[in-house]
C-alpha cells in the first residue's frame, strides 16, 4: 500500500423532506443530488435497498454528479434479508446489471445483514465466492449480530477481498475489523440510532481514524445515517472539514 488512500464522505441517502429548508434551502427535490455532490465527495444510495432502480435512474445520477464523485449503493434486501444469503448468484447478477449505469462512479456495494441473522460461515463463503461475478467494484458487508465478529469470518473476507462495514449505532455493536484496502464506515447515531448528532469530540476521533487509514493507503468511505433533524449532512460537512484541516496541518509540519 504505497500510495495514500482517498476519502469519500457523505450521507446515506439524500431525499429527506425534513432537510428541504435547513439544508437544501428550499430547493426542489430534483436539485438535491446535485446540491449534495457539490458539498460531499460521495454518497450512499439507500433507496436501492428497498426497491430495485432502473438502469436509466443510475445513468441520470451519473450525469448529475461531477467526475470525481463516487456512489456506494446499498444492495437490495431480497438477498440479505429475505434469502439470508441463500442462492446468491442470480441476485448478484441482477444487481450488477441494474447498477452498471453508474459506470466508474460506482465505488462500493454495501450488503447489510439483518440484526437477527446469526453467523453462518457456509452461507457467507458461498456468498463471497458468488461475488467474484462482480469484480468490477468493491464490496462491504455490514454485520449487526455479534456472532459474526470472529477470526474465521474476518479471514473469509480477507480471502475474498470484502470489507467489514464498521457500523456505529446505539442498537447494535460495532466490529472494527479491517480486512481489505477499503474501510467502510456507517455512522447511524451513537447515542440514539438514526436520531442523534455526533459531538465534536466523536467526529475528531473518527477523523483521526480516517487519517490513519488513509496514510496506510486504504480508501475510506464514511456515510452518516443519523438523518433525523438534519444531523447527517451537518456531521458529514464537519468531518470533511476536520480531515481537510488535518491534511493542511500535516503539510505544514512537512514544510517546517
Model regions and ranges:
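Residues lining hydrophobic/aromatic ligand-binding pockets adjacent to catalytic sites
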Residues: 1-256
Amino acid at each position: 500500500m504505497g500510495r495514500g488512500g482517498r476519502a469519500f464522505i457523505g450521507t446515506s441517502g439524500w431525499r429527506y423532506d425534513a432537510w428541504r429548508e435547513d439544508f437544501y434551502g428550499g430547493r426542489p427535490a430534483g436539485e438535491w443530488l446535485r446540491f449534495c455532490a457539490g458539498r460531499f465527495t460521495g454518497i450512499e444510495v439507500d433507496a436501492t435497498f428497498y426497491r430495485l432502480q432502473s438502469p436509466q435512474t443510475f445513468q441520470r445520477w451519473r450525469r448529475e454528479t461531477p467526475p470525481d464523485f463516487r456512489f456506494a449503493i446499498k444492495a437490495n434486501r431480497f438477498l440479505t434479508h429475505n434469502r439470508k444469503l441463500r442462492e446468491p448468484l442470480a441476485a448478484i447478477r441482477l444487481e450488477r446489471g441494474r447498477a452498471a449505469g453508474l459506470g466508474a462512479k460506482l465505488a462500493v456495494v454495501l450488503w447489510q445483514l439483518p440484526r437477527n441473522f446469526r453467523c453462518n460461515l457456509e452461507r457467507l463463503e458461498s456468498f463471497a465466492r458468488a461475488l467474484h461475478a462482480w469484480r468490477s467494484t468493491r464490496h462491504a458487508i455490514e454485520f449487526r449480530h455479534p456472532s459474526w465478529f470472529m477470526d474465521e469470518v474476518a479471514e473469509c473476507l480477507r480471502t475474498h477481498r470484502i470489507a467489514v462495514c464498521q457500523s456505529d449505532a446505539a442498537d447494535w455493536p460495532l466490529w472494527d475489523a479491517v480486512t481489505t484496502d477499503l474501510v467502510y464506515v456507517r455512522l447511524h447515531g451513537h447515542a440514539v440510532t438514526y436520531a442523534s448528532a455526533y459531538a465534536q469530540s466523536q467526529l475528531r476521533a473518527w477523523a483521526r481514524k480516517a487519517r490513519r487509514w488513509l496514510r496506510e493507503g486504504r480508501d475510506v468511505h464514511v456515510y452518516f445515517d443519523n438523518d433525523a433533524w438534519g444531523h447527517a449532512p451537518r456531521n458529514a460537512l464537519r468531518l470533511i472539514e476536520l480531515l481537510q484541516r488535518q491534511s493542511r496541518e500535516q503539510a505544514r509540519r512537512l514544510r517546517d
